[in-house]
Amino acid sequence: MALKDEFATRNFSIYGQWLGILSMILCFALGIANIFTFRPIIIVFSVITLCFSFVILFVEVPLLLRICPTSPTFDNLIRKISTNYTRAAAYGVMAVVVFLSCIDRTTSLLVPGIFLSFTGICYALAALKGQAFVGSKTLGGAGVAQMIV
């Protein structure tokens, strides 16, 4: 199934997975961009956002759990984020944490917060509509995702 066919299924978990990849890229890029400031609280939130980007990478591309040497504790944590409900909750928590960075001063970290929110909403819609989680074949395939989980 091609990427166009995956989007045509109207399964919100596919939309969530691709928005998650976009969120990961934004968290990484804007996390690095906001480290170079003189405000310590922004630096802390930038590092947290950078950490979120790596967590999202392992959540959305489960094949990496097999390839990269990680601890069993980290593997178990990532494997718990496997259903649409848990993914929606995880992205919701990450979005709230990133939005908290705007307490001190509004920065470009607002953008990853918005995309993390959209990703959480997509996974929540998939869960509420009763749609099963479907992994994109482009990002490792559904068969690979079930083999790892």
Curated annotation (Swiss-Prot):
GO CC annotation terms, alphabetical: Golgi membrane
Major localization class: Golgi
Listed transmembrane segments: 18-38, 41-61, 84-103, 108-128
Record's bilayer topology term: Multi-pass membrane protein
SMART domains for the chain: Cg6151-P
Glycan attachment residues as annotated in the record: 11
Places the protein is found: Golgi apparatus membrane
Pfam families for the chain: Cg6151-P
GO biological process, one term: vesicle-mediated transport
Keywords: Glycoprotein, Golgi apparatus, Membrane, Transmembrane, Transmembrane helix
Superkingdom of the organism of origin: Eukaryota
Protein family membership: Belongs to the TVP18 family.
Function field: Golgi membrane protein involved in vesicular trafficking.
Protein name: Golgi apparatus membrane protein tvp-18
Organism, as annotated: Neurospora crassa (strain ATCC 24698 / 74-OR23-1A / CBS 708.71 / DSM 1257 / FGSC 987)
